[in-house]
């Protein structure tokens, strides 16, 4: 077998099965089952996932979230976007699958996903639910990947990997401030809606987040330290969501009715934490 063919096969295997980065010396990766699922059953595992996020209930108009958009079949978690009738504010049904567990913290998180081919997002991210009784309080969001399979604006979320960190800060007077920090972009090839890709994130510590694509390191994100020296240290929920953006033209009813374009597929999601090798 030629070297080129062998390398190609190796890349295919990595893309299909995922690959954790080498652990630090003296440590090993251990699977975190609370945030892992192969989606091999016939229904969503409700011990692990909500079919409609209780933390972000409605979504961003014109799309909202409906549990009926979510299914597990053919070995995939599927979120099928569709026309929603009878609602003046929302006319598109998307989906927001959220973890039951709320303690995702430092570790490695990855999902094998194929985006829809419409102008809605296909995403994999994490966020904490704030305690609004605190003063001040923060919401932290870790966007591992946000892609859009059909672009109608000039922004390329189809072939460029977009990852970000956001801190939503509310002071004791109710004044809100947002600080965001991302990384350099990386190419998604083939485009996000044409093939499955493994999107990974090593949340190293409160200041360091490394992004991976198909098992390869791409860039590092350093969350803003505007409010605290250790900004990203709060446990989070995991989300797999399809939504509309206020900067992107929504899909047409005809596009939403096309079953070859309207669905985002998650083959699996896997998560790992570090433990000493002697444990």
Swiss-Prot record:
Keywords: Glycosidase, Hydrolase, Periplasm, Signal. CDD domains: GH16_beta_agarase. Its EC number is 3.2.1.178. InterPro entries: Beta_agarase (IPR016287), ConA-like_dom_sf (IPR013320), GH16 (IPR000757), Glycosyl_Hydrlase_16 (IPR050546). It comes from the Bacteria. GO terms for biological process: carbohydrate metabolic process. Residues 1-18 form the signal peptide. It is an enzyme of class 3 (hydrolase). The keyword Hydrolase applies. Substrate binds at residues 56, 60, 141, 146, 243. It is found in: Periplasm. It catalyses: Hydrolysis of beta-D-galactopyranose-(1->4)-alpha-L-galactopyranose-6-sulfate linkages in porphyran. The active site is at residues 141, 146. Residues 19-277 form the GH16 domain. Its main location: periplasm. GO terms for molecular function: beta-agarase activity. GO terms for cellular component: periplasmic space. The keyword Iron does not apply. Cleaves the sulfated polysaccharide porphyran at the (1->4) linkages between beta-D-galactopyranose and alpha-L-galactopyranose-6-sulfate, forming mostly the disaccharide alpha-L-galactopyranose-6-sulfate-(1->3)-beta-D-galactose. Belongs to the glycosyl hydrolase 16 family. This is Beta-porphyranase E. The lineage of its organism: Bacteria, Pseudomonadati, Bacteroidota, Flavobacteriia, Flavobacteriales.
């Amino acid at each position: 077998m030629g070297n080129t063919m062998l390398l190609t096969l190796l890349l295919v295997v990595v893309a299909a099965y995922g690959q954790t980065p080498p652990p630090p010396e003296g440590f090993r990766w251990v699977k975190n089952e609370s945030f892992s699922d192969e989606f091999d059953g016939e229904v969503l595992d409700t011990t692990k996932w909500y079919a409609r996020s209780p933390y972000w209930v409605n979504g961003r108009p014109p799309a909202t979230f409906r549990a009926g958009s979510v299914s597990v079949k053919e070995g995939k978690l599927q979120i099928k976007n569709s026309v929603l009738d009878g609602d003046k504010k929302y006319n598109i049904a998307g989906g927001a699958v959220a973890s039951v567990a709320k303690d995702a913290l430092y570790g490695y998180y990855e999902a094998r996903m194929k985006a829809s081919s419409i102008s809605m997002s296909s995403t994999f991210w994490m966020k904490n639910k704030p305690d609004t009784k605190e003063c001040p309080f923060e919401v932290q969001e870790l966007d591992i990947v946000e892609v859009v399979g059909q672009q109608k604006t000039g922004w390329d979320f189809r072939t460029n990997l977009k990852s970000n960190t956001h801190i939503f800060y509310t002071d004791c007077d109710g004044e809100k401030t947002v600080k965001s920090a991302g990384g350099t972009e990386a190419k998604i090839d083939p485009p996000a809606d044409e093939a499955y890709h493994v999107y990974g994130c090593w949340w190293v510590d409160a200041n360091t987040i490394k992004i991976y694509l198909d098992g390869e390191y791409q860039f590092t994100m350093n969350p803003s330290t505007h409010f605290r020296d250790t900004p990203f240290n709060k446990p989070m929920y995991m989300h797999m969501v399809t939504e509309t953006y206020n900067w992107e033209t929504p899909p047409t009813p005809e596009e939403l009715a096309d079953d070859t374009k309207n669905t985002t597929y998650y083959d699996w999601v896997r998560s790992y934490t570090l433990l000493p090798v002697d444990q």
